[in-house]
């Protein structure tokens, strides 16, 4: 990136600086000129303000070029650290960028800061409350994305001239946030995702299919013991033959008032019971 810098009056031609990506090359080019009164920090400040400077090394922040804004004539207050501190940071702008870093606090806005990606750290500079009130009328802060390196615990917001009159006061928040909207649950909940014991639940699909027939029970049926007459008839048929035929099953079902399935299951259980009794007597223990 190239930037033209106008020095003292005896310097006629502008001096061009070419900055490479390496840190050593930038530090070498940022040194003060031999035979002049410009220290290294003033060379950095000149790059931030490409406008003409007075012969004495003091300057004021004039029209700062901002991309996309068609209202010239806005002036910003100079940073006091550029004249008092030898390690002063850049007053405004990242070498011609349209975004300006400002540290935002509850009480007042502190001085402008330079990102550490250019070799310097943030330096604090006091700013009076009157200066902040006048500056707040000229500039409005909007949240955006800056091309500068990210600095933890600092808030970088772009500064653009206010479109309204200087006397008007902007009541917008510095960082607008979307209001919280709770989830919309269509199941009758009260806006929050939680379950309570008293919450009414809709009937499942499998339960709705059984509502028409109230006689159908879910799960295992209740055990109904056989009567003595039924057991006597079953034992008599079992003594005659341990295995039941189809015709015999129908006849026993008609006599005992039991279903054919019940008769078949009883004969199966009776054979298993007899087998257990026989095995128990056969075992020596």
UniProtKB/Swiss-Prot annotation:
CDD domains: homeodomain
GO cellular component: nucleus
Localization terms from the record: Nucleus
InterPro entries in the record: AP_axis_regulatory_Homeobox, HD, Homeobox_CS, Homeodomain-like_sf, HoxA13_N
Identification of the protein by name: Homeobox protein Hox-A13b
DNA-binding region(s), residue ranges: 219-278
Keywords assigned: Developmental protein, DNA-binding, Homeobox, Nucleus, Transcription, Transcription regulation
PROSITE patterns in the record: HOMEOBOX_1 (PS00027), HOMEOBOX_2 (PS50071)
Function: Sequence-specific transcription factor which is part of a developmental regulatory system that provides cells with specific positional identities on the anterior-posterior axis.
Tree of life domain: Eukaryota
Cross-referenced Pfam families: Homeodomain, HoxA13_N
The gene coding this protein: hoxa13b
Family: Belongs to the Abd-B homeobox family.
Single Gene Ontology MF annotation: DNA-binding transcription factor activity, RNA polymerase II-specific
């Amino acid at each position: 990136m190239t930037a033209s810098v106008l020095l003292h009056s005896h310097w006629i031609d502008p001096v061009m600086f070419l900055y490479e990506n390496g840190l050593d090359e930038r530090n070498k080019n940022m040194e003060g000129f031999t035979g002049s009164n410009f220290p290294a920090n003033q060379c950095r400040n000149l790059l931030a303000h490409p406008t003409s400077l007075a012969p004495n090394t003091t300057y004021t922040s004039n029209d700062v070029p901002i991309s996309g804004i068609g209202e010239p004539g806005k002036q910003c207050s100079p940073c006091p650290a550029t004249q008092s501190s030898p390690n002063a940071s850049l007053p405004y702008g990242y070498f011609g960028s349209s975004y300006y870093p400002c540290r935002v606090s509850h009480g007042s806005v502190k001085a402008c800061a330079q990102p550490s990606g250019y070799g310097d750290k943030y330096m604090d500079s006091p700013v009076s409350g009157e200066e902040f009130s006048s500056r707040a009328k000229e500039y409005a802060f909007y949240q955006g994305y800056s091309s500068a390196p990210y600095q933890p615990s600092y808030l970088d917001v772009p500064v653009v001239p206010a479109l309204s009159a200087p006397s008007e006061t902007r009541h917008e928040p510095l960082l607008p946030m979307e209001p919280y909207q709770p989830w919309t649950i269509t199941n009758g909940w009260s806006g929050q995702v939680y379950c309570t014991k008293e919450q009414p639940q809709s009937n499942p699909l499998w339960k709705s299919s059984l509502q028409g027939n109230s006689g159908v029970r879910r799960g295992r049926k209740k055990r109904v013991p056989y009567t003595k007459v039924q057991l006597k008839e079953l034992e008599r048929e079992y003594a005659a033959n341990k295995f039941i035929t189809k015709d015999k099953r129908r006849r026993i079902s008609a006599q005992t008032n039991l279903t054919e399935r019940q008769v078949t299951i009883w004969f199966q259980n009776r054979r298993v019971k007899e087998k257990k009794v026989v095995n128990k007597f056969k075992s020596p223990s």
